[in-house]
């Protein structure tokens, strides 16, 4: 089948007569040579480019097109932003400004590299058992090349058994690399099955080196902390606020855009008493407390709250963080409630409580525009201000921040 790609779907795939064409661009003339059915969708598994779209650029990553990490790296960045604006208009029904990421390479502060007999890298798109071998990850930056080189030497010299995904065998499974972009501190976490990890300090001189053991049957890139070398935490800094990073704690993955995110949230809040729901490690709450707001935060994750309390201490601010689920917390008496839920959106009980107890302002931070649109329809509030931030260049994902009154 021959034709011209006219549009992308919401996942960033080109569409040609009902067939999804990954890594294509609007304006590409292509020939589809093979089609497979994937989860009830027809996907071009093999196609040939006849004439290139003017929207195309040369991807910086050599693994682009096979690696499942980036899907839009072949599109110029201005068009990536336009694609996200169009996507938001379709979902929300109105135009939303998309703030560009300050950096579009070297912006990610975390990557989880699988370590297998076939290579070190990320899963091939659509193939959980297959790893694309890489030398570096351009969206993370130059530290990734250094870490991968040292890892290969570590494995070879110490004769370490690595992962066979299909057989679920092998000792060393993942290397998780994290970096404070504003502090230049680096952490590496080796995730293994039961066994003994040789001393990595002869090969790695990063600020913090961890060894974690995944004792579950799940394929996850974290586990029980066995031991660490160097610093217990690394730090990231957003403006004048420091945050501790631990292997088992979450932090916004684009530090450069996270600065714009916390600044925007601080612009939108009103009053003095702030409730920080889904607070995590206190990213918003501590930034606001540093600016004199009276902050109380809640999260259902006990370790996240432990980290939030540590962040309170190192920043010398006055803020409280407690463990509680979104179904339990009263929002009464707060001037502004910040909600930053997981992709599933707000729990229905929280929606009812917000409608009943009526805080003056809700600042809604969302990584899923579709659940955001659903929740806003259920809330007895209107959108006073909204902006999108491109936290995830080269992917179809986008972050929303809205003030509801």
Swiss-Prot record:
It comes from the Archaea. GO terms for molecular function: 4 iron, 4 sulfur cluster binding; metal ion binding; tRNA (uracil(54)-C5)-methyltransferase activity, S-adenosyl methionine-dependent. It is an enzyme of class 2 (transferase). GO terms for biological process: tRNA methylation. The keyword Iron-sulfur applies. Keywords: 4Fe-4S, Iron, Iron-sulfur, Metal-binding, Methyltransferase, S-adenosyl-L-methionine, Transferase, tRNA processing. Activated by magnesium ions. Its EC number is 2.1.1.35. Pfam families: PabTrmU54_TRAM_dom, tRNA_U5-meth_tr. Catalyzes the formation of 5-methyl-uridine at position 54 (m5U54) in tRNA. Belongs to the class I-like SAM-binding methyltransferase superfamily. RNA M5U methyltransferase family. This is tRNA (uracil(54)-C(5))-methyltransferase.
């Amino acid at each position: 089948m021959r034709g011209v790609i006219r549009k992308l779907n919401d996942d960033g795939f080109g569409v040609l007569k009902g067939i999804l064409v990954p890594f294509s661009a609007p304006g590409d003339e292509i020939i589809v040579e093979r089609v497979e059915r994937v989860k009830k969708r027809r996907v071009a598994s093999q196609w040939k480019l006849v004439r290139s779209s003017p929207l195309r650029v040369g991807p910086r990553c050599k693994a682009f097109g096979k690696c499942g990490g980036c899907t839009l790296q072949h599109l110029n960045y201005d068009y990536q932003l336009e694609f996200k604006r169009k996507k938001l208009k379709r979902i929300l029904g109105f135009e939303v400004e998309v703030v560009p990421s300050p950096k579009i390479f070297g912006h990610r502060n975390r990557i989880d590299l699988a370590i297998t007999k076939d290579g070190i890298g990320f899963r091939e798109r659509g193939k959980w058992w297959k790893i694309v071998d890489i030398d570096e990850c351009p969206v993370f930056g130059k530290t990734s090349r250094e870490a991968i080189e040292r890892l290969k030497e570590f494995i070879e010299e110490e004769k370490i058994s690595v992962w066979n995904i299909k057989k679920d065998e092998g000792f060393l499974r993942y290397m998780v690399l994290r970096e404070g972009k504003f502090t230049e501190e680096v952490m590496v976490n080796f995730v293994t099955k039961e066994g003994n990890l040789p001393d990595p300090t002869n090969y790695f001189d990063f600020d913090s080196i961890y060894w974690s053991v995944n004792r579950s049957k799940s394929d996850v890139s974290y586990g029980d902390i066995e031991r660490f070398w160097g610093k217990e935490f690394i730090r990231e800094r957003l403006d004048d606020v420091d945050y501790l990073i631990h292997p088992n704690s979450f932090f916004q993955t684009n530090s450069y855009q996270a600065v714009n995110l916390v600044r925007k949230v601080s612009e939108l809040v009103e009053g003095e008493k702030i409730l920080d729901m889904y607070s995590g490690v206190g990213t918003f709450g501590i930034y606001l407390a540093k600016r004199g707001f009276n902050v109380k935060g809640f999260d259902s994750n006990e370790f996240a709250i432990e980290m939030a309390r540590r962040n309170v201490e190192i920043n010398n601010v006055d803020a409280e963080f407690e463990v509680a689920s979104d179904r339990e917390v009263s929002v009464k008496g707060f001037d502004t409630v910040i909600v930053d839920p997981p992709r599933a959106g707000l729990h229905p009980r929280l929606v009812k409580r917000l409608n009943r107890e009526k805080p003056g302002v809700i600042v809604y931070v969302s990584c899923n525009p579709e659940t955001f649109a659903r929740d806003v329809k259920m809330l007895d509030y209107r959108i006073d201000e909204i902006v999108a931030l491109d936290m995830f260049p080269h992917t179809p994902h986008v972050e929303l921040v809205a003030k509801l009154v």
